[in-house]
Amino acid sequence: MSIEAPTQAPKPSVTLAEAAGRKAMRRLLPFLLLMYVLAFLDRANIGFAQKALLHDTGLSDAAFAFGAGVFFVGYALFEVPSNLALHRVGARIWMCRIMVTWGLISAAMAWVQSPTSFYVLRFLLGVAEAGFFPGIIYYLTQWFPQSSRARAIGVFYFGAPLAFIFGGPLSGLLLEMHGTFGLAGWKWLFLVEGGLASAVGVWAFWYLVDKPEDARWLSPDERRALTSAIQLDAREAAAHGPRDALAALFDRRVLAYAGIYALIQMSVYGVIFFLPQQVASLMGASVGLKVGLLAAVPWLCAVALTWIVPRRADRLGGHRAWAARLLVMSGVGIAVSGLAGGLGGTAGAIVAMLGLCCAASGFIAAQPLFWTFPARDLAGAASASGIALINSLGGLGGFVAPMLRAAADRNFASHAAGLELLGLASIAAALLILVVAPRAVAPAARSFEPPVRRAR
């Protein structure tokens, strides 16, 4: 006579997988967050250095906009090869390589003397950093199942606002070191922030663990439970998504997500690259510590919303609807910041800052939700190449955004025109998400069983 196992048997494995996931969050996410903070600092520090850099090197506004964007050309060209290399050699080795090389190139920005050297170093910085962001997203899919993935990516995304909360004042202080040891403040900015990236890259080699089954800080049962949960997601993704790295590059869903992400990145970088100067204009001050502190306010709002929304979506579902709402809010906020800033006076400045708070909160909090959509359709090498392609093509939005904003302002003789255009891009992304993204992501209610050992 056979005895059936109780129907509630999977519950302990659910608890075990969740416990292992919480351990992984505590162990990995603070370090990944630090890495992303440094990545964002190295991308956006030219926004703080802009005025002094242009003054000392003679670059024009158009040359600066092109140089700010050419980063994304190198980034896009080498994104997919870089992520496939990470899939092959592991995050520990590849993230070390990425961070050390981009830190050295960022520090070399201190020796920019002409438009040509500016373009070359910005392009090389993109090449060096290629694969960092999609590599981390792919890495998180190897550590966290779908039921907790938005929360994990959401914590990682804190890096963007935190880079401005702490990076704004830090950049302001470094700029005020002008003349120390005979170096201009903007040179100190690149040297210090680039050096920090290289140092953390070396640390990453010793700290990161490639896969749950290699984590000594998890018990054997926890390793099995977490690995089982992730493998279940991978099998489901492989069943209806592209089966290999090459197929993912031509998959219609992947290309559609890349188009959506490009629109999101247009709004993100069209704001980020000019935010310090926009805040300085509202204050009637030059970029420094005070401007850095005020420029941190929108990112404080972004941290709060990014903490709340992905957790709510993982618990209750509705990733698609939340992402669309946040991007509409962001688009309206971007446009309002430009229109109100042109009114002048204290009231106009306050409304413009509120608009920037809505803009930053919306486009930062929406992105962890966005990345759960392609992750449900991709697994293995297809996941590595597909995520890289989305980020690569999407990053081109960051390339064109500064130039589109500058061109719109110039052609319409209005500093609000470019921001209105970027706001429309964010709203268009929201509408496309409603068309392309899956209608629902089930709340975290799945069971994961570790492999069952046969009785001997």
What are these regions (language model features)?
Residues H319-F373:
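C-terminal transmembrane helical hairpin of 12-TM major facilitator-type secondary transporters
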Residues L121-F158:
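Cytoplasmic helix-loop-helix junction between adjacent transmembrane helices
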Residues F78-A91, A304-G318, D409:
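Helix-to-loop junctions at the C-terminal end of transmembrane segments
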Residues L77-T116:
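Conserved MFS/SLC helix-loop-helix module at the cytosolic interface between two early adjacent transmembrane helices
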Residues A152-L175, L196-A197, N391-A401:
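Glycine-rich segments within core transmembrane alpha-helices of 12-TM secondary carriers
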Residues I46-G47, A248-T306, Q367, W371:
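Extracytoplasmic gate region of multi-pass secondary transporters
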Residues D377-F412:
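A late C-terminal transmembrane helix in Major Facilitator Superfamily
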Residues G58, G90, W111-S117, A128, ...:
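Helix-breaking motifs and short loop linkers at transmembrane-helix boundaries and internal kinks
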